[in-house]
Design a protein with these regions (language model features):
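PAPS-dependent sulfotransferase catalytic domain
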Residues: 297, 309-311, 449-452, 457-489, ...
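Start-of-helix register in tetratricopeptide repeats
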Residues: 14, 48, 82, 116, ...
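Register position in tetratricopeptide repeats
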Residues: 25, 59, 93, 127, ...
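Structural marker of alpha-solenoid helical repeat scaffolds
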Residues: 42, 76, 110, 127, ...
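PAPS-dependent sulfotransferase catalytic core
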Residues: 370-372, 376-492, 636-637, 641
Length: 671
């Protein structure tokens, strides 16, 4: 199982089940049963309490009751490997070999680090004459026995999503056992799951220094590099794997294709993806990746067909339906709409598929002008997404206050002349769904401007400046900006330009359209003072509700609650007003509604700001052939119209909370 297959941590129950583990080790099963039932009265869905209850019941000879408890556990935690392991033990106690084998096989399919399951499988396979499968199970068991028990235990916890328990165990082990590659690799995988990619990179580099032939670690190293948007380096690692392990080339080729997508080589990626199709349900993800690349290239009909193939390859694949809806121009058939309703209502559908289906149904019903029902699905989808986001608006608001306190006019005056003198970057900032893709398409139609993508380079620099922080610690950024020397600031500017180089051709200017960079304009001005910055702004209710309707592939956690979106918009206005005060004239604000009303006038204004001559193809931007990777990709390939400006008014009866949270922002957004 790859590092990305680990499931999300289970929600902690209201009371601590850990004391019951000690009772289990002492085989005090009656006390375990009483304790687990007490916990379940407080938290009926408690994962570990349900498991301990089942274990106690089995050991007390009450196997049917144990199986009932496991059925309850499966309803709430269907990807918890130990429930299937315990179910296997229950069936074995009843001498039901076939269902026992099925249960143990399910357990190890979710979690390879279960020695007891492998041991039971080996014995059951031998007993039923399946010698080949018995040998495979014996081999897996032997592999686990070669690894330190502490590492196996921590790996098992990790694969069940228990990161908070796994991480201290493996760190303690490394403190006493030094550079042990399996332990280091596991800690890297935990870092990947926590999205601490810098730590994961360092650990995997160390593993490969010690064990250069460790292919699983090299594959995970490539995954980390892709997550860090260093796709060219990832391809080097994948090419090494494909050369050394040609019989498993297709195993690596899908990730290689993903790296190609990151580098803008979409046609090549489509061909590579097609080579890894297998005719199984696994093809659903491959068809989806093909469709995304086709959509980026503007191949709308081909993308629709590929999205439909993804839906057909895996029934209930919510992402395929949402991706069709996310084309913005696609209209579902009555049969597709009915199918989506049925899938969303199915109790067996997974949470991720359900939330994708909710957003897709919201868009489909909005297109049919069934606004009340559409809002109900949008609301449900957002509630599902918000429940797992962990977003805290207070953190963004606190960071904004720090930006304002640190990045004063005096701060910049004292550092005048610092940073790189390169004028190449044109930053487009603001909120998502604010017209930034339209501005990018207009500017990228100019002969001297390269349209790249939403580059993560600024965020990577910010992450390095922050270092590793605990949630309980005050952030080093942005205060750390005041500690940087002139040389360090210059190096940051050159690092940014180097990171962007892989996405450019020979045009003198390029666009970085990462909306959230508005939060880092102090850093950007420090390291790239000659860069141009364009603030793409949209009327607040339209902008916020458009974000509420959008399910983002990653990030943008503030968009899954109307109140959170409104608070974020107000914070954005506050910070942009600050940049206008301390860096007057450095940022050009472009109001989306003004572009729709007078496209040529706004195009001329944009090009004047960039110091470039007017070119008529910028007005006819929809004719420009280029890759567009955002949710607005189909919309910017059409002439401008006013259709989207007032769509929020169809949902006005349900937007009271949004208006209340926005407050005076609905009036002052043009100030």
């Amino acid at each position: 199982m790859s590092s990305t297959d680990a499931i999300s941590p289970a929600a902690a129950p209201a009371a601590d089940p850990r004391p019951l583990r000690a009772l289990l080790r002492q085989r005090k099963f009656a006390e375990v049963l009483a304790g687990s039932r007490a916990l379940l009265e407080q938290s009926p869905e408690g994962r570990d309490a349900l498991l301990f209850q089942a274990i106690a019941l089995r050991n007390l000879g009450r196997v049917p009751e144990a199986l009932d408890a496991l059925s309850t556990l499966e309803r709430h935690h269907p990807r918890f490997s130990r429930l299937y392991e315990e179910r296997g033990h229950c069936f074995a106690a009843q001498r039901r070999a076939v269902p026992a084998m099925d249960a143990f096989a399910k357990a190890v399919s979710l979690n390879l680090a279960l020695p007891a399951s492998w041991s039971m499988l080996e014995g059951l396979y031998r007993m039923t004459g399946q010698t080949g499968k018995a040998a495979e199970a014996a081999n897996e068991l032997a592999t686990l026995r070669r690894i330190a028990p502490e590492v196996v235990g921590a790996t098992s916890l990790f694969l069940d999503g228990d990161l908070d328990e796994a991480e201290p165990l493996i760190r303690d082990y490394l403190l006493t056992h030094g550079n042990e590659v399996e332990a280091m690799r596991l800690l890297a995988r935990i870092g990947m799951a926590r999205k601490v990619f810098d730590d994961a990179e360092i650990l995997l580099e160390a593993v490969l220094q010690i064990a250069p032939d460790y292919r699983a670690a090299r594959l995970e190293y490539a995954e980390v590099l892709i997550e860090m948007h260093r796709e060219a380096e990832a391809r080097v690692q994948l090419e090494k794997l494909m050369a050394e392990d040609p019989q498993n080339r297709l195993h690596y080729q899908g990730l290689y294709a993903t790296a190609c997508v990151g580098l803008g080589e979409h046609e090549r990626a489509i061909g590579l993806y097609r080579e890894v199709l297998t005719g199984t349900t696994a093809d659903a993800d491959v068809h989806l990746s093909i469709a995304h690349a086709q959509k980026t290239l503007g191949q709308r009909a081909e993308a629709i067909e590929s999205y439909r193939r993804a839906a057909a390859a895996r029934p209930g694949f919510g992402d395929a339906y949402w991706s069709l809806a996310n084309l913005k121009t696609y209209r579902f058939t009555p049969q597709e709409l009915e199918q989506m309703r049925a899938l969303e209502a199915d109790p067996a559908i997974g949470r991720i598929d359900r939330l994708h289906l909710c957003f897709a149904l919201g868009k489909a019903l909005e297109d049919q002008r069934s606004f009340a029902e559409a809002f109900r699905y949008y609301q449900l989808g957002n509630e599902l997404r918000h429940a797992s986001s962990g977003y805290a608006p207070e953190i963004i608001e606190s960071n904004t206050r720090q930006q304002i306190a640190v990045c004063t006019a005096e701060f910049f005056a004292a550092r005048q002349g610092w940073g790189s003198i390169a004028p190449d970057p044109i930053f487009i900032v603001g909120l998502p769904r604010s017209g930034s893709t339209l501005l990018e398409q207009i500017l990228a139609s100019h002969s001297q401007i390269e349209g790249t993508q939403e580059l993560a380079t600024v965020q990577q620099i910010v992450a390095r400046l922050r270092g590793r922080e605990l949630k309980s610690e005050a952030s080093r950024y942005p205060a750390v900006l005041a500690e940087l020397s002139r040389e360090e600031v210059g190096e940051l500017g050159e690092r940014y330009l180097k990171g962007a180089r892989v996405y450019r051709t020979d045009k003198p200017f390029f666009i970085d359209k990462m909306p959230n960079n508005f939060r880092h304009l102090g850093l950007i001005h420090l390291m790239l003072p000659r860069a141009k910055v364009i603030d793409a702004r949209r009327e607040p209710i339209a902008c916020c509700f458009s974000n509420f309707k959008q399910l983002f592939a990653k990030g943008q956690e503030f968009t899954y609650s109307l109140e959170d979106i409104a608070r974020y918009y107000r914070t954005y206005l506050e910070l942009m007003a600050h940049w206008d005060r301390v860096l007057p004239g450095w940022v050009l604000r472009v109001q989306h509604e003004d572009v729709v009303a007078d496209v040529e006038g706004q195009v001329r204004r944009l090009l004047d700001f960039c110091g470039l001559p007017f070119e008529p193809q910028c007005v006819e931007f929809h004719k420009t052939v280029r890759s567009v990777r955002t949710a607005s990709s189909e919309q910017v390939r059409q002439p401008l119209n006013r259709e989207g400006l007032d769509q929020w008014q169809n949902f006005e009866p349900w937007l009271g909370a949004l208006k209340d949270a926005l407050g005076d922002a609905v009036r002052r957004y043009r100030e």
